[in-house]
Structures are given as structure tokens and as C-alpha cells.
């Protein structure tokens, strides 16, 4: 089994694929990170600094490795790459005569975020009312216009879609972004959900058996998707067939599981598990093989004490099998009464209907019975502690917000909130940034190109006002985003989608 170890302060990093997996092929790099195209006419209105020699001076750097922030640094960007990182403008040596020099005193530069649970859709509940009731079916409209802009505006320069309901749309959208015709991040396109029978989502194909799972993976791999995701009602046999076919093609597979437990999936060779430890069902009462429980993992999370034997045993199993875990804390924060409200800029991106649905959800949470509120709060704290314990044991934690939940988690804004919640979980700010940047790059096998601020890597960078290493909420103040050395204007991108998320 391939394994790469990277030593950084306080965190063990590794790159591997599940049992029996093939090496990540070099073609994956060219698919996810193709040669950059010049921004076209439709993209230029959102460009603040066209590519060219750019020098960022007097800036604080959080480099993505988990190490302490470094003050008064100079970063030279040229030809879409980080040409140099030095401790002063003088140390950078002679600058190109045509270089654009920015004095970024009072600002911090981070690596571009590598979002690992970053959907391109919105979940709509028809005729949702204040009591939380809606009419079937659940609908999943594609946000091909608004989502890529929201991600890029908030510093997400590479993302994994982590499940698709319109895979052809996602593939075509990626091609348009890569060609410079539409603004958006680099994209690892995940295939359609590999779901079993029983899903409430009418847009998902229910797998008939393991042969269907294998054929589905093969078909979409041939069409260009670069990852796969198993979903709640998939059986062990179907999951095993999907894993084997994905690995045969050098691709990875993750899962938001229910009918299959975390231990079972790890034994089958899965590469990643979504939603931290919030959806594991192994301790749910009455759990039967290949059957999703009514609890959907709530009982397991509530009963699994972070320092208890069940948690330690599970974490050891996942670490020993090199299974990554994706943290998606913002979507679970929605169930905690009194959680932080949407930031005004995020709220402004929602359609009136999405805004109403979000407020319904928030009010329902606040008005839940006291015992339910207490139970959810305790479960959320368990989830935070389990993710921290997983990393302490040597596990690879990656991150994404899961922008669902009636508009309660918004693309891009949710990625930033995820970093804040990782700090709440006990990580240092620099370590939280690492989880959201370099760790995702390592999982994708792209750490030689993205994920940290190092000379020679792609110039995917986020400039924020303030110092997130001391006040993590400063990470919300994104002022400039570089992708392949091109500086994008977050405010222009946000204005273009104002009131649009939830519509298109």
C-alpha cells in the first residue's frame, strides 16, 4: 500500500489509498489541475489582478503546514506559480521591472482552500412550512452559476464535488472553468451518488446489485469523473464492487454511509468517510446488516465517548487501514440551538425562498424541547472531540462544509466556517488551516502542486484582512483570491450572485 509521510508540527500527514487500491495516476493531476487558461471575456470582470509578476510584501503567512504564522514575509508570484517566499522584499532580490507590488501590512495570506465536501447543488424541500413539513419529492437543483463563484470568492481554489445529481453538468462546468470561460475553482468531479434502494432523493439512481455498482463506476470513470461517493442505502456487496472498480482505475471512493458501518467500509477498502463521526451506525440499537437505521448514527455518536474504548478502537481501525475522514462541521452545527447565524454576506447570496427556509430551520432548532437541545449539543461536542482524537492518533482529517440544510450552509462561506469550528474542536488556527488546505491536497495526491505556500507550487492563495492565527474569525475577511496567479475580486463575484443561491 502506497504511503507518504510528511512531518509537521503536531500532526501526522499521510497519503494512501484503501486496501487493494492502485497508485493515484499522474493523469489525475492533469485532469484536476490542467494547464491554466487565460481568463476569457466573461471572467475578466471578476479579475482584479491579471496574471503577471506580482509581489506581496509585509504580509503574514499561514503556510498550510500547521506551523506557526510567519510575519513580514514577501511572496513573489510569476507565471502562475509561487516563485519565492522570503523574509523581506530585499531578500527577494531584484524584482521584474513590470512587477505589481502590493503592501499587505495588516493582512494574512493562506493557501487556497481545498474543499473536500463542496457540492454544486442546493437541496430544496417543496412547500416547506414553519413546522418543517414539506411535500415529496426532495429536489436537488444544480447551482452551476452561483456555487462556483461563491466558492472562489471565499478562497476555495480546488474542490471535490463529493456527489453529483447532474454529473454531465458538473463535467461540462469543469471544462468551461478550465477553459477560462466561467469563474470557479479547480474541480475533482465526483460521479453520481452510488445509492442503494430506499433513498428519498428522486434524482438518484438506485443500484440493483453489485454488478450495477461496478458498471456505474466504470461508465462514469470513462466519461471523466475523478472520484466516487457511496451513499446511505448502499449494501456491503455493492460497496465492495464499487470500491474494487474505482481502485482498478486508480480512483478513490468516499462514503456518507448508514446501512454499512464505518468498520465494515474500512474493511472493504474505502478511502474516506464523510461527516466526521456523525453518521456511523455501528452502535445504533437494532442495527442489522445492510440496513440503514432510523437513528442515522445519532445513537452511536451520543453513546461513543471520545475517550472510551469504542471510540479508541474505531479510530485505531481507521488509522491502521489509512482511511481518511472528512470533517463537515457546519452542516451539523445547524442542529445546535444558538449556533452562529449566517454571516450577512452569506445571507445576501440566498434567494428569498432559501432565506425563508433557512430561518424556518433555525427557528425549529431554537424551539426544540430542552432535552432535545441538550442532547444535540452534547452530540455535537462528541463529534468535535472525536475528530480531534482521530488526528491525534495519526489520522488524515480533511474538510468541507456540505452546503445543504435549507440554505444553512452556503458554498465558500461554509468552508471558512469549517475552519473556525475546527478551532472550536481544539485545533490551533494554523492546524485548522492545514486540515482545510494541505490535508485535502495530500488526499488527492496533489500536494506537490497545491495546499501550502512553498516556492514552486501553484499560486493559489487567499488574502484576508487581519490575523487568523490570533483571531480565527478574521478568516472571514477575504479581500483577494489568487488562482493560478490570477487575482480575483471576491466582492465582484459575490455581487454577481446576490440573491441567486437556491435558484441557479
Identify the meaning behind each predicted range:
Residues 38-41, 46-48, 52, 61, ...:
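Histidine-rich, glycine-flanked metal-binding segment
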Residues 458-501:
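C-terminal cap of metal-dependent C-N hydrolases
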Residues 144-167, 185-192, 221-234, 252-254, ...:
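Divalent metal-dependent hydrolysis catalytic cores, especially in the metallo-beta-lactamase
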Residues 58, 107, 117-121, 256, ...:
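Histidine-centered divalent metal-coordination motifs
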